[in-house]
A protein has these predicted regions:
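Cysteine endopeptidase catalytic domains of the caspase/legumain-like
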Residues: 1-290
């Protein structure tokens, strides 16, 4: 797992649950008995550490490391808030931002991460497998959480999940997943510690779907996220449909992390195992909320 890298961001502040989500992801991935990532290969930025500068520095560090490798897997997880903001010079044009620690309404370029810059850095990552998870537009306990640092902005703020994903270059080995669409919210269900999107991701990373597989595949992740998130919010009369990128040549051998609950099957029973990869890939292909 020495060629597996991760950048995990939880903005925190008024969105305290985002730091908890990021911490849960980090703890599972770097656990040697679970995700198996080397601690030195994980950049972990939460609360005051999740500044724009630290995010950019961490991305550039990953860019530098992956340039030297033939094959690498990179996971970028962001839990916070995305914004769609009219351009200062031309209000007809829209800019996309990810909130970072210290966001200042008067200095958005200096204190928030512009989607174009984020996309540029992501493009520079030379990894044959790249997974971007965006858990934006949080609602705590089924209620929307305000961001006090951004209150009073004399601009129209809109969620930016779809716009941000559209800026990212898709392609073979590149998978982008956002927790919800622009007119929706990423919720924390009553009694849950983490957002529903992150909770479902954690279940997959922990091997819930494929206990007989040594590694967790991105096919399992995409399948479970787009299947479970919309289903689990229905009893609360809520709609939440994750957005995924269109992925060509999606391979069941695209692994995200080690399966901490791996239970090897006896040799004499291996021929009786059911491989669900083809069925899950078809389910993903037929999902209609894509970029």
């Amino acid at each position: 797992m020495e060629n597996f890298f991760a950048l995990i961001i939880g903005v925190g502040g008024d969105l305290a649950a985002t730091a908890e989500d990021a911490t849960a992801i980090k703890n599972l991935l770097c656990d040697p008995n679970k995700g198996g990532y080397l601690p030195e290969n994980i950049a972990f930025l939460v609360n005051d550490d999740s500044t724009k500068k630290n995010v950019i520095d961490s991305l550039e560090n990953i860019i530098s490391k992956t340039k030297k490798l033939d094959k690498a897997t990179v996971l970028v997880y962001y839990s916070g808030h995305g914004l769609q903001i009219p351009n200062d010079a031309d209000p007809e044009k829209t800019e996309y931002f990810l909130k970072t620690s210290g966001a200042d309404k008067l200095k958005k370029e200096e204190t928030m991460l512009n989607g174009a810059l984020f996309s540029e850095k992501i493009k520079q990552i030379k990894a044959d497998k790249l997974l971007i998870l965006l858990d934006c537009c949080h609602a705590d306990g089924m209620k929307y959480k305000n961001i006090s640092e951004l209150e009073g902005m004399m601009i129209e703020e809109k969620p930016s999940n779809r716009g941000l994903l559209e800026k990212l270059d898709s392609g073979e080995g590149r998978v982008f997943i956002s927790a919800c669409d622009d007119n929706e919210e990423s919720v924390i269900l009553p009694g849950s510690k983490n957002s529903l999107f992150t909770e479902v991701c954690l279940e997959v990373f922990d091997g819930k779907l494929s206990p007989n597989d040594e590694f967790v595949s991105v096919v399992d992740l995409m399948y479970y996220v787009i299947k479970e998130v919309p289903k689990r919010v229905l009893p609360f009369h809520h709609i939440q449909r994750p957005i995924i990128s269109e992925v060509h040549h999606l391979s069941p051998d695209y692994f995200v992390c080690r399966n901490g609950n791996y239970k090897p099957v006896q040799k004499d029973l291996e021929d009786f195992l059911i491989n669900n990869s083809a069925e899950r890939i078809d389910f993903i292909k037929n999902y209609n909320n894509k970029i």
